[in-house]
């Protein structure tokens, strides 16, 4: 879910066209997979599956979104979460319970014929399993796209790569990337121009947020941004009741973070969270290698193993590796 900073970041969001985003993008892989599993579903909430009952929603999302990236001159690198920090355990347990309850409500809605509620609850029950991650990595490898297994938080790894210049920007729907120090965050980088938010469909377009512009505009340091995040609540702590983004900013700008914690949460030590955002476990000096797609391998996986329509897969691949004279992938590899 990430830190709830949207309210104070609105004026720093800049609409972008796909054409202006050519470059190398570090994609929050787990975040992307969750989106695919949530959105790519049948009207009653059932995920897309092959004849054997194996979920294919994530593979469809990975395949077509990645092709769209490449077609638009974006070289993606998918970053996957490693071992979650102990700080996150409470959040993980809470999310697991939310998914479990959503699954129960999904079944109940189906039983009473309430398709709209069933779809809503099905989305909330989405779960990224080890098999889903493994098959996504397999597909990306066949597509010639590098995958990075982060030692801990994928967003932290993506932010580090953006800060070092290994990639042009980080891609995630969450704002944690800014707390981790990503100089440029891009959101809404999706194939569809629509998203479902709180039960309704809205039009969206890619947008970028520059960390230096945010800090300068708000008149704070990155350290104070992290402090504000902790006051509001992060994946590692619940925050202080009644403290939203605007109040949190006022507090940190007056150097009141420590006093507020001492007053409201006397038994809470924010030091481990501060340190984790400042210096999370990441892999430095990565060597990224893009390769031409293995069309036969892609067809074997998607069509042979998962039942995708062969013609649809071939047509999609043709868009980026088409006949002579057309734009091809060669310039990227």
From Swiss-Prot:
<dbReference type="GO" id="GO:0017108">
    <property type="term" value="F:5'-flap endonuclease activity"/>
</dbReference>
<feature type="region of interest" description="N-domain">
    <location>
        <begin position="1"/>
        <end position="99"/>
    </location>
</feature>
<dbReference type="InterPro" id="IPR019974">
    <property type="entry name" value="XPG_CS"/>
</dbReference>
<dbReference type="InterPro" id="IPR006085">
    <property type="entry name" value="XPG_DNA_repair_N"/>
</dbReference>
<keyword id="KW-0479">Metal-binding</keyword>
<feature type="binding site">
    <location>
        <position position="28"/>
    </location>
    <ligand>
        <name>Mg(2+) 1</name>
    </ligand>
</feature>
<keyword id="KW-0234">DNA repair</keyword>
<feature type="binding site">
    <location>
        <position position="153"/>
    </location>
    <ligand>
        <name>Mg(2+) 1</name>
    </ligand>
</feature>
<keyword id="KW-0540">Nuclease</keyword>
<feature type="region of interest" description="I-domain">
    <location>
        <begin position="117"/>
        <end position="256"/>
    </location>
</feature>
<dbReference type="InterPro" id="IPR036279">
    <property type="entry name" value="5-3_exonuclease_C_sf"/>
</dbReference>
<dbReference type="InterPro" id="IPR023426">
    <property type="entry name" value="Flap_endonuc"/>
</dbReference>
<dbReference type="Pfam" id="PF00752">
    <property type="entry name" value="XPG_N"/>
</dbReference>
<keyword id="KW-0227">DNA damage</keyword>
<feature type="binding site">
    <location>
        <position position="174"/>
    </location>
    <ligand>
        <name>Mg(2+) 2</name>
    </ligand>
</feature>
<dbReference type="InterPro" id="IPR006084">
    <property type="entry name" value="XPG/Rad2"/>
</dbReference>
<protein>
    <recommendedName>
        <fullName>Flap endonuclease 1</fullName>
        <ecNumber>3.1.-.-</ecNumber>
    </recommendedName>
</protein>
<dbReference type="InterPro" id="IPR006086">
    <property type="entry name" value="XPG-I_dom"/>
</dbReference>
<feature type="binding site">
    <location>
        <position position="155"/>
    </location>
    <ligand>
        <name>Mg(2+) 1</name>
    </ligand>
</feature>
<keyword id="KW-0460">Magnesium</keyword>
<keyword id="KW-0378">Hydrolase</keyword>
<dbReference type="GO" id="GO:0000287">
    <property type="term" value="F:magnesium ion binding"/>
</dbReference>
<feature type="region of interest" description="Interaction with PCNA">
    <location>
        <begin position="325"/>
        <end position="333"/>
    </location>
</feature>
<dbReference type="InterPro" id="IPR029060">
    <property type="entry name" value="PIN-like_dom_sf"/>
</dbReference>
<dbReference type="GO" id="GO:0006281">
    <property type="term" value="P:DNA repair"/>
</dbReference>
<comment type="subunit">
    <text>Interacts with PCNA. PCNA stimulates the nuclease activity without altering cleavage specificity.</text>
</comment>
<dbReference type="InterPro" id="IPR019973">
    <property type="entry name" value="Flap_endonuc_arc"/>
</dbReference>
<feature type="binding site">
    <location>
        <position position="81"/>
    </location>
    <ligand>
        <name>Mg(2+) 1</name>
    </ligand>
</feature>
<feature type="binding site">
    <location>
        <position position="176"/>
    </location>
    <ligand>
        <name>Mg(2+) 2</name>
    </ligand>
</feature>
<dbReference type="GO" id="GO:0008409">
    <property type="term" value="F:5'-3' exonuclease activity"/>
</dbReference>
<comment type="function">
    <text>Structure-specific nuclease with 5'-flap endonuclease and 5'-3' exonuclease activities involved in DNA replication and repair. During DNA replication, cleaves the 5'-overhanging flap structure that is generated by displacement synthesis when DNA polymerase encounters the 5'-end of a downstream Okazaki fragment. Binds the unpaired 3'-DNA end and kinks the DNA to facilitate 5' cleavage specificity. Cleaves one nucleotide into the double-stranded DNA from the junction in flap DNA, leaving a nick for ligation. Also involved in the base excision repair (BER) pathway.</text>
</comment>
<keyword id="KW-0235">DNA replication</keyword>
<dbReference type="InterPro" id="IPR008918">
    <property type="entry name" value="HhH2"/>
</dbReference>
<dbReference type="GO" id="GO:0043137">
    <property type="term" value="P:DNA replication, removal of RNA primer"/>
</dbReference>
<feature type="binding site">
    <location>
        <position position="235"/>
    </location>
    <ligand>
        <name>Mg(2+) 2</name>
    </ligand>
</feature>
<dbReference type="Pfam" id="PF00867">
    <property type="entry name" value="XPG_I"/>
</dbReference>
<keyword id="KW-0255">Endonuclease</keyword>
<comment type="similarity">
    <text>Belongs to the XPG/RAD2 endonuclease family. FEN1 subfamily.</text>
</comment>
<keyword id="KW-0269">Exonuclease</keyword>
<dbReference type="GO" id="GO:0003677">
    <property type="term" value="F:DNA binding"/>
</dbReference>
């Amino acid at each position: 879910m990430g830190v709830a900073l949207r309210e104070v970041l609105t004026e720093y969001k800049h609409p972008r066209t796909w054409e202006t985003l050519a470059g190398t993008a570090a994609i929050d892989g787990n975040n992307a997979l969750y989106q695919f599993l949530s959105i790519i579903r049948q009207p009653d909430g059932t995920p897309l599956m092959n004849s054997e009952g194996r979920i294919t929603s994530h593979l469809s999302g990975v395949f077509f979104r990645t092709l769209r990236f490449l077609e638009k001159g974006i070289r993606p690198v998918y970053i996957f979460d490693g071992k979650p920090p102990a700080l996150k355990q409470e959040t993980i347990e809470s999310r697991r319970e939310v998914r479990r309850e959503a699954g129960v409500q999904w079944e109940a809605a189906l039983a009473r014929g309430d398709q709209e509620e069933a779809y809503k609850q099905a989305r909330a029950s989405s779960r990224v399993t080890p098999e889903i991650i493994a098959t996504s990595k397999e597909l990306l490898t066949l597509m010639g796209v590098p995958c990075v297994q982060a030692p801990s938080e994928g967003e932290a790894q993506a932010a580090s790569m953006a800060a070092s210049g290994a990639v042009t920007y980080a891609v995630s729907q969450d704002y944690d990337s800014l707390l981790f120090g990503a100089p440029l965050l891009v959101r809404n980088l999706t194939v569809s121009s629509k998203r479902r938010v709180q039960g309704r469909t809205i039009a969206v377009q890619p947008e970028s947020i520059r960390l230096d512009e945010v800090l300068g505009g708000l008149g704070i340091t990155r350290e104070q941004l992290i402090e504000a995040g902790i006051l509001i609540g992060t994946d590692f702590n619940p925050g202080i009741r009644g403290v939203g983004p605007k109040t949190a900013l006022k507090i940190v700008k007056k150097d009141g973070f420590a006093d507020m914690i001492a007053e409201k949460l006397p038994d809470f030590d924010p030091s481990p969270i501060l340190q984790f955002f400042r210096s999370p476990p990441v892999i430095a000096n990565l060597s990224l290698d893009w390769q031409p797609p293995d069309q036969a391998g892609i067809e074997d996986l998607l069509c042979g193993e998962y039942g995708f329509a062969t013609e649809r897969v071939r047509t999609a691949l043709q868009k980026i590796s088409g006949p002579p004279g057309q734009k091809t992938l060669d310039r990227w590899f």
